[in-house]
């Protein structure tokens, strides 16, 4: 059976995912068979495995850092919020329905926990070590009875817990001490150390606080991790989008329309590595700049709600004016559906309306169906689109959607010959169900260089290639920083190495 160790946090977004990845990568580079695990994840940013299962993106990155193909056992439960009060529940890669928080815990808690135990035991039989990531905070007293992602998992795996706090946001010492106070006595015994994450400044000035923390709690500080800029780690929720967007002036400005249920924003991850691209998220009318070279409508977990959000804020009028100028617009998955004439929902898969008028920029109609398509796929473009350089070439990506979209008029074209079309175009407007479109190097390179030439700029020939290789380089960087700033000898002692 594998030995385990777990990272829990004083709050969401303190860096549990990155530290889990870092230790997993270190163990992998040191020659051990290691796998990541997170019992339950809540995220809109998901991934499709080779066998068509859906799982959280953070565990995908952690699996890659371990040299593994991602498997749903690494994240057996995924909650994808579809409203402020409800989520689609994914268990071992497959959706089992939409539930409110209350109904989920009342109706599905025991079944879900059995799936978690089975998934963990499967991994524990195959690997030397399991590095586990918790969720949120283990000290949410109102949620503790139903919390399966933190201490319950730690007890299942007999995993010592490293408690992580984000010192960049302030209040880190209070949050560590407060979290320890709110844990039950047997839970406190599981905590083997603290890590202060995202530190900027003079470490000497921090040392008195570390001494105080150790004396106050009796728990050792295992390390102080510095703030690492421009991490290429997939974000799981839109809270952290602003931290990943460049604020530096660059030649090309790409606007990404933001809405409350934005999903799969890893579609734009590669742009972080393009030397001439500035990504700007469009939340308000004021954010919609006149000098955008390209605008993207991303995926959505609730297309109708996000369509209404755009209309209520007048962003639909901005999009009409933008397209009228002949400027390029790309919609991905939910973005494609929003660009069409209307959305049909006869079985009320997404909401309470059976028919909704969309933006009408593409001549398409989307119908939501109960069965969900989740698969990796590729399609060959069978006719040239005239602008986006798709000329009988194969593009690949993955699909996650309930909708089926078809042509409804003559102004738009289907560019591929699949049974359920994946790529639609009308002039300089492109819509597709393919997540990962921009990871196709040839497509991204040609598009960006075309945008440059339209501004009178020379193209760039040596652009980044292979997002996979870029990620691996990034994982090595994170592991190196972890080795330099964390007491790895002590952690290895805890693991019995």
Curated annotation (Swiss-Prot):
One Gene Ontology MF term: catalytic activity
Pfam families from the UniProt entry: CbiA, GATase_3
Protein name per its UniProtKB record: Cobyric acid synthase
Family annotation (HAMAP family): CobQ
BP-aspect Gene Ontology terms: cobalamin biosynthetic process
Family named by the database record: Belongs to the CobB/CobQ family. CobQ subfamily.
Active site: 333, 435
CDD domains documented for this protein: CobQ_N (cd05389), GATase1_CobQ (cd01750)
Keyword Aminoacyl-tRNA synthetase: no
Function: Catalyzes amidations at positions B, D, E, and G on adenosylcobyrinic A,C-diamide. NH(2) groups are provided by glutamine, and one molecule of ATP is hydrogenolyzed for each amidation.
Aminoacyl-tRNA synthetase keyword on record: no
Domain GATase cobBQ-type: 251-443
Keyword list, A-Z: Cobalamin biosynthesis, Glutamine amidotransferase
Pathway(s): Cofactor biosynthesis; adenosylcobalamin biosynthesis
């Amino acid at each position: 059976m594998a030995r385990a160790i777990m990272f829990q946090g004083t709050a969401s977004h303190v860096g549990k995912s990155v530290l889990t990845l870092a230790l997993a990568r270190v163990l992998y580079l040191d020659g051990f068979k290691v796998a990541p695990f997170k019992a339950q994840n809540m995220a809109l940013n998901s991934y499709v495995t080779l066998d068509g299962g859906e799982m959280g993106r953070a565990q995908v990155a952690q699996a890659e850092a371990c040299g593994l193909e991602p498997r749903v056992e690494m994240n057996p439960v995924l909650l994808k919020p579809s409203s402020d009060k409800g989520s689609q529940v994914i268990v071992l890669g497959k959706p089992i329905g939409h539930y409110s928080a209350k109904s989920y815990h009342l109706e599905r808690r025991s079944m879900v926990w059995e799936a978690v135990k089975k998934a963990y035991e499967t991994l524990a039989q195959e690997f030397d070590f399991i590095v586990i990531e918790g969720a949120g905070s283990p000290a949410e007293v109102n949620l503790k009875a139903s919390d399966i992602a933190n201490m319950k998992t730690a007890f299942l795996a007999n995993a010592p817990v490293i408690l992580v706090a984000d010192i960049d946001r302030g209040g880190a010492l209070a949050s560590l001490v407060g979290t320890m106070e709110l844990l039950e006595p047997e839970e406190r015994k599981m905590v083997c150390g603290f890590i202060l994450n995202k530190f900027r400044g003079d470490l000497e000035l921090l040392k008195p606080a570390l001494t105080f923390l150790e004396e106050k709690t009796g728990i050792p500080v295992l390390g102080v991790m510095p703030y690492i800029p421009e991490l290429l780690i997939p974000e799981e929720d839109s809270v952290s989008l602003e931290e990943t967007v460049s604020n530096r002036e660059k030649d090309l400005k790409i606007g990404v329309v933001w809405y409350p249920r934005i999903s799969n924003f890893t579609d734009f991850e590669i742009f972080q590595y393009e030397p001439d691209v500035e990504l700007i998220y469009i939340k308000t009318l004021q954010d919609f700049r006149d000098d955008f070279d390209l605008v993207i409508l991303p995926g959505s977990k609730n297309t109708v709600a996000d369509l209404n959000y755009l209309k209520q804020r007048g962003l639909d009028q901005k999009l009409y004016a933008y397209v009228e100028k002949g400027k390029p617009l790309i919609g991905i998955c939910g973005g494609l559906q929003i660009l069409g004439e209307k959305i049909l929902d006869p079985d009320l898969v997404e909401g309470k309306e059976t028919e909704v008028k969309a933006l009408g920029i593409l001549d398409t109609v989307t119908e939501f169906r109960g069965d969900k398509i989740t698969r990796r796929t590729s399609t060959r473009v069978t006719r040239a689109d005239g602008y986006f350089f798709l000329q009988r070439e194969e593009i690949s990506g993955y699909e996650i959607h309930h909708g089926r979209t078809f042509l409804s008029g003559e102004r738009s074209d289907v560019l591929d010959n699949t049974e359920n079309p994946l790529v639609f175009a009308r002039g300089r407007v492109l819509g597709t169900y393919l997540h990962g479109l921009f990871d196709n190097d040839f497509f991204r390179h040609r598009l960006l260089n075309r945008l440059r030439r339209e501004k009178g700029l020379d193209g760039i020939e040596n652009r980044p290639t292979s997002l996979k290789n870029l990620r691996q380089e990034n994982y090595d960087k994170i592991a190196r920083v972890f080795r330099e700033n964390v007491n790895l000898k002590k952690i290895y002692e805890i693991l019995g190495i």
